[in-house]
């Protein structure tokens, strides 16, 4: 693909004032690669920061750059064709689609798939080998069910949603349009509901449902549990990594991002655009406001306000956590000083 063709296809995707290109070179681009291993005839991207130095040494034939005149000049001097954008990472994400399309089977129902006669199947649906679609399931247009996926009775799945191999969707779950459920994920299993009695524990039946709004993505081996009553809901465009647990009655807002090994107890509420880094744990009924961020391994026991950035366990403002961490490193020294004062 010629560089000019790439530029032409990408230019409508960004605001015109935030995209520039060096027009005098039009090389052939054969692949898209990370900047660290870029070779001749490939295109890569640089956001700046520690990667800025790669402009001077990369073998890439073309680059997507930030709106940085110094980096652009370096690329010119090395004969590298370039595009520049206010958001080079986003432009690079669009560029990947020009070179790669994920596997999408043709519409068909495999001979070994088990589809209940009462299931309603939309147009251009693919159902892979050994998949199970039980009674009263509704599949929208363009849905793709990969091999060994299991869909329990009464599930509704919206248009163009993809269920990857070996995922399980329990009864009455509602999944919107353009969602992606990755392999091994379990949506709508029973929440952890038991009442203590003298004999041990009395099981509370989980009669509620799980709702995934449009554009939700659930990573491999993640779980979203249904509640005893009511619903567990994940807002539109929220993205959830692998190995995440979302307990019963959780309410997650729109466009949130949850990294691997996040664990949420029952009844947690997240606002919109909340970011939870890896291994964040959230206690029962805690509420987190819009735009809040929790850094890796934060333990949240109480409510967090909108826009707050928290770290540590128990969670505290990130700036305070940095001071605490600095003091923690000096504890042996401080201990010895206190010990001397006691003498």
UniProtKB/Swiss-Prot annotation:
Q: One cellular component GO annotation, for this chain's record?
A: carboxysome
Q: Does the keyword Nucleotide-binding apply?
A: no
The UniProt keyword set, sorted, is: Acyltransferase, Lipid A biosynthesis, Lipid biosynthesis, Lipid metabolism, Repeat, Transferase
Query: Catalyses which reaction?
Result: a UDP-3-O-[(3R)-3-hydroxyacyl]-alpha-D-glucosamine + a (3R)-hydroxyacyl-[ACP] = a UDP-2-N,3-O-bis[(3R)-3-hydroxyacyl]-alpha-D-glucosamine + holo-[ACP] + H(+)
PANTHER family the UniProt entry points to: UDP-3-O-ACYLGLUCOSAMINE N-ACYLTRANSFERASE (PTHR43378), UDP-3-O-ACYLGLUCOSAMINE N-ACYLTRANSFERASE 1, MITOCHONDRIAL-RELATED (PTHR43378:SF2)
Q: What is this protein called?
A: UDP-3-O-acylglucosamine N-acyltransferase
Q: What is the lineage of its organism?
A: Bacteria, Bacillati, Cyanobacteriota, Cyanophyceae, Oscillatoriophycideae
Known function: Catalyzes the N-acylation of UDP-3-O-acylglucosamine using 3-hydroxyacyl-ACP as the acyl donor. Is involved in the biosynthesis of lipid A, a phosphorylated glycolipid that anchors the lipopolysaccharide to the outer membrane of the cell.
Family to which this protein belongs? Belongs to the transferase hexapeptide repeat family. LpxD subfamily.
Spell out the coiled coil positions from the record.
none
The source organism is: Microcystis aeruginosa (strain NIES-843 / IAM M-2473)
* Biochemical pathway: Bacterial outer membrane biogenesis; LPS lipid A biosynthesis
Example of a GO biological process term: lipid A biosynthetic process
Tell me the domain of life: Bacteria
User: Which Enzyme Commission numbers does its entry carry?
Assistant: 2.3.1.191
Q: Report the active site residues.
A: 248 (proton acceptor)
State the oligomer form and interacting partners. Answer: Homotrimer.
Q: Gene for this protein?
A: lpxD
Q: What does the record give under GO molecular function? A: N-acyltransferase activity; structural constituent of carboxysome shell
One Pfam family assigned to this protein is Hexapep
């Amino acid at each position: 693909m010629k560089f000019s063709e790439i530029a032409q296809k990408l230019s409508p995707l960004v605001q015109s004032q935030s995209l520039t290109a060096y027009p005098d070179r039009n090389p052939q681009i054969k692949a898209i690669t990370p900047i660290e291993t870029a070779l001749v005839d490939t295109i890569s991207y640089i956001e700046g920061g520690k990667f800025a130095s790669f402009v001077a040494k990369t073998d890439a034939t073309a680059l997507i750059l930030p709106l940085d005149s110094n980096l652009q000049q370096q690329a010119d001097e090395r004969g590298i064709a370039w595009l520049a954008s206010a958001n080079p990472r986003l432009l690079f994400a669009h560029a990947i689609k020009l070179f790669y399309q994920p596997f999408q089977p043709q519409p068909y129902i495999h001979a070994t798939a088990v589809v209940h006669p009462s299931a309603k199947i939309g147009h251009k649906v693919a159902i892979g080998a050994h998949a199970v679609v039980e009674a009263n399931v509704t599949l929208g247009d363009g849905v793709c069910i990969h091999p060994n996926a299991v869909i329990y009775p009464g599930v509704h799945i919206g248009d163009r949603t993809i269920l990857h191999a070996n995922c399980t969707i329990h009864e009455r779950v509602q999944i919107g349009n353009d969602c992606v459920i990755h392999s091994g994920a379990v949506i709508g299993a029973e929440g952890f509901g038991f009442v203590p009695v003298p004999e041990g524990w009395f099981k509370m039946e989980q009669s509620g449902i799980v709702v995934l709004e449009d554009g939700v993505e659930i990573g491999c081996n993640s779980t979203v549990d249904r509640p005893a009553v009511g619903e567990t809901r994940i807002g539109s465009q929220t993205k959830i990594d692998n190995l995440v647990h979302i307990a019963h009655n959780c309410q997650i807002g729109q466009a949130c991002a949850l990294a691997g090994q996040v664990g949420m107890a029952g009844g947690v509420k997240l606002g919109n655009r909340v970011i939870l880094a890896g291994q964040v744990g959230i206690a029962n009924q805690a509420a987190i406001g819009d735009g809040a961020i929790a850094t890796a391994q934060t333990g949240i026991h109480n409510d967090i306000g909108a826009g707050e950035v928290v770290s540590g366990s128990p969670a505290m403002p990130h700036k305070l956590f940095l001071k605490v961490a600095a003091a923690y490193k000096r504890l042996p020294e401080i201990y010895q000083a206190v010990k001397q004062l006691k003498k």
